[in-house]
Amino acid sequence: MKPVYTAGIKLYGLGARVAALRSAKVRDFVNGRRRALRQLEELTAKHAPDGYDYWFHVASLGEFEQARPLIEKIKSHNPEANVLLTFFSPSGYNVRKKYELATTVTYLPEDTKKNAGRLLDIARPRCVVFVKYEFWLNMLECIRERNIPAYLISAIFRPGQIFFKPWGGQFRECLRTFRTIYVQDEKSRDLLADIGITDVKITGDTRFDRVHDIMRQQISYPAIESWRADAFTLVVGSSWQPDEDRYIGWINAHPEVKVIIAPHEFDHHRLTALHKRLDRPSVLWTDIVSENGDITDIPTDTQTLIVNTFGKLASLYRYADAVIVGGGFGTGIHNINEAAVYGVPVIFGPNNRKFKEAADLKKLGGAFEYTTSDDIATLLNRMMSDTAFLSAASSTAGRYICDNLGATDVIFKDITSQA
């Protein structure tokens, strides 16, 4: 199995290099991984010559948000701790490469035994934390061989994963690298127990702690508050074109509704296409922000605010009466907890099966799934007209977040007591 895995890694790398010839995004990924070890060596020599106290590895932005509460907890207790943060995805690295609580931020290099050994030689981490889905066999094998304390946090497992297949022995073995696996639910714990992995704790998802921290910061924009006034306000987070195909018709038919749209991608082509579909006055975030970052007055005729910048969405959900979260017609929905923490009902597309919080909130009545334009129209019309329905859904969403706080504290106490 291991030779097959390594061959697969090599083929994936080759495919990425071929794709990079025509895609700037893939080219960024390939170049970032190619220079990762050299960059790590240079930055470590400069900022952490004695190595790193903690190495956190995440796939992309979503997993970074799961690691972030733990990093912040560590740094608040030990400001001098050196933290290495690695990303697999360019979308995560490019946004968070200057994350102020990390001593060094780099890509994870291609997962070969040679690269894994060299990374550990350079970084010399004293504690390793992987997040959710990241299972790189060569890297985990090297960590285990060196007896470096390693932990997996916010993990979730499903019966269809390779760990639970007859041919998944090498992947099952890699799980033994982790001294403790912190899972989100009982089903994950039971699946692991069935394959002999018992160093497992149910702690839930650290993202609940993260979104609660954001909410408590109470970042506000008075100009937006004045603009929305008493109007029903819909916020659409991480919007993709397939989402827009279904909800824009409703938006155009309701000029009385104030709408905030944060596209997942906002290059010139994407923004131009979105503007053309909106049959209502709209303004870009960058057109109303001052040099010091404050929002100026929003033109009175504006019905839609398009957020074409990173880092604002989580705070803007506080102004919503209802939220649509995108991604449900693609690879999967984006972060719904960021909205639910404000006590706001969340609506999303059908590709949500891998997200425990989506299943929980649908069952409880704090979130709703839609497939067609008629579905979304029916839901939004009811939320606008039935105050009891909207109030119940809102309360349910907020209460769900509060009921699931605390994973970060448990994990922090464990890994620091074992350090």
Segments predicted by a language model, with ranges:
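Active-site and donor-binding regions of nucleotide-sugar-utilizing enzymes
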Residues: 17-217, 235, 239-241, 254, ...
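Structural alpha-helical scaffold elements that stabilize or flank donor/cofactor-binding regions
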Residues: 119-121, 174, 227, 316, ...
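Hydrophobic beta-strand scaffold residues
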Residues: 148-150, 259, 282, 346
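Conserved catalytic-core segment of nucleotide-activated headgroup transferases in glycan assembly
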Residues: 63-77, 217-289
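Catalytic binding pocket for nucleotide-activated donors in carbohydrate/polymer assembly enzymes
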Residues: 178, 194, 313-399
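Acidic donor-binding loop of glycosyltransferase active sites
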Residues: 123-127, 298-331
